[in-house]
């Protein structure tokens, strides 16, 4: 954060003019120039003291209209500042925003409404700090300025965008059977359950994300959640070799893959499937079992994922009963790796790659994969895969 100079351009000019007047008065013996120089210097010093001496302190609270900010979504931030000072200063305020969030977070102080509000738009997923609040004041002559930070920062979570996807051509369940829906699972809403504080050892599946966001500490659901095998599995391949090396800017291909991961999981859950979302190392990123809070938990986890490490064998990742729909999302895929990729008995395996190298699609198809190239438009890639599945035996419902 760049610190402002104590003098404005006008103030610096006045100080330079004062020095020049004093020098000229000595050279030419002109007393009036000496008076002018001393007056400018005194005025600059007075302005500097008037701005810098008053003691100010205060607290800042921020309220965001949405618990989670989605990429491309616009939300509103309300800032309340309790300022303690001898007199209310007049100036300009601005809230410091990270590059991952866009918005016009500034205006005149004090505001007419008594509170500060501004819109923000999610640009890049992740957990980012908002603040601190900066207040800039200038003396009446415009010679000196002061910029002071108030309050602490607040974290905001930007989650991947979820797109509407076309329905599957046919409903399939575990091991190719009919997909089943548990009415007890889908009938419950996590918001109807009383959350409690997190205790070491609690399952991450039971974290109540909305209550956590509201209270600022980890909260979990109190009910005993039954463990069950998923009807569908979504795998996000985070292997470092599949993606570009991390840099200052986000990898567009990986961001698209994360967004498809979220979209596919939410879509399958909306069709009645219980869904597990895992990465290529076997880490559980989310489990959608019909609770209203499951979606938020998945999106929060996906907000923080990045390419890393190496992947494991897909059959070892899934284990147990093969799922019905299996969605595998990867980056750069060559023919050799595609030939080793087996769907582990899944009834409806779909493979999405952001960069299919020559021969990769042909090597994966004989194993039962429906292969689609994942481009910028996620819905189109999904529709291509769903349409292709009709050609390999699925019957439209």
Locations of regions flagged by a protein language model:
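Extracellular/lumenal glycan-associated context and N-glycosylation machinery
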Residues: 1-61
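Short, structured coil/loop segments at alpha-helix boundaries
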Residues: 9, 30, 98-99, 291-292, ...
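An amphipathic, basic-hydrophobic helix/alpha-beta surface used to engage anionic
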Residues: 42-286
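Exposed, interaction-prone extracellular/peripheral surfaces
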Residues: 2, 200-397
């Amino acid at each position: 954060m760049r610190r402002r100079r104590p003098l404005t351009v006008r103030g610096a000019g006045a100080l330079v003019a004062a020095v020049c007047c004093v020098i000229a008065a000595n050279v030419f013996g002109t007393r009036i120039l000496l008076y002018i120089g001393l007056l400018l210097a005194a005025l600059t010093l007075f302005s500097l003291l008037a701005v810098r001496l008053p003691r100010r302190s205060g607290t800042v609270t921020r309220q965001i209209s949405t618990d989670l900010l989605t990429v491309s979504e616009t939300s509103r931030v309300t800032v309340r500042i309790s300022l303690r000072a001898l007199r209310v200063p007049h100036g300009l305020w601005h809230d410091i925003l990270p590059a991952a969030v866009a918005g016009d977070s500034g205006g005149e102080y004090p505001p007419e409404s008594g509170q500060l509000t501004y819109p923000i738009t999610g640009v890049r997923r992740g957990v980012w700090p908002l603040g601190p609040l900066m207040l800039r004041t200038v003396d009446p002559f415009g010679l000196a300025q002061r910029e002071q930070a108030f309050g602490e920062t607040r974290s905001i979570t930007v989650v991947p965008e979820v797109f509407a996807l076309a329905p599957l051509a046919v409903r399939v369940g575990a091991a190719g059977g009919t997909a089943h829906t548990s009415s007890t699972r889908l009938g419950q809403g996590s918001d109807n359950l009383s959350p409690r504080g997190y205790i070491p050892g609690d399952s991450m599946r039971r974290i109540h994300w909305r209550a956590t966001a509201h209270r600022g500490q980890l909260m979990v659901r109190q009910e005993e959640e039954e463990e069950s095998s998923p009807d569908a599995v979504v795998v996000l391949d985070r292997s470092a070799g599949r993606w570009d090396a991390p840099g200052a800017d986000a990898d567009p291909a990986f961001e698209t893959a994360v967004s498809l991961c979220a979209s596919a999981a939410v879509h399958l859950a909306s069709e009645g499937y219980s869904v597990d979302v895992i990465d290529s190392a076997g880490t559980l990123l989310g489990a959608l079992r019909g609770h209203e809070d499951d979606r938020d938990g998945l999106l929060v986890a996906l907000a923080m994922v990045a390419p890393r490490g190496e992947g494991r064998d897909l059959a070892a990742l899934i284990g147990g009963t093969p799922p019905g729909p299996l969605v595998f999302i990867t980056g750069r895929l060559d023919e050799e790796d595609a030939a080793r990729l087996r769907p582990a008995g899944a009834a409806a395996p779909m493979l999405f790659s952001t960069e299919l190298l020559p021969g990769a699609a042909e090597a994966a198809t004989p194993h039962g994969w429906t292969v689609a190239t994942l481009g910028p438009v996620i819905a189109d890639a999904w529709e291509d895969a769903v349409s292709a599945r009709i050609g390999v035996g699925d019957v439209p419902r």
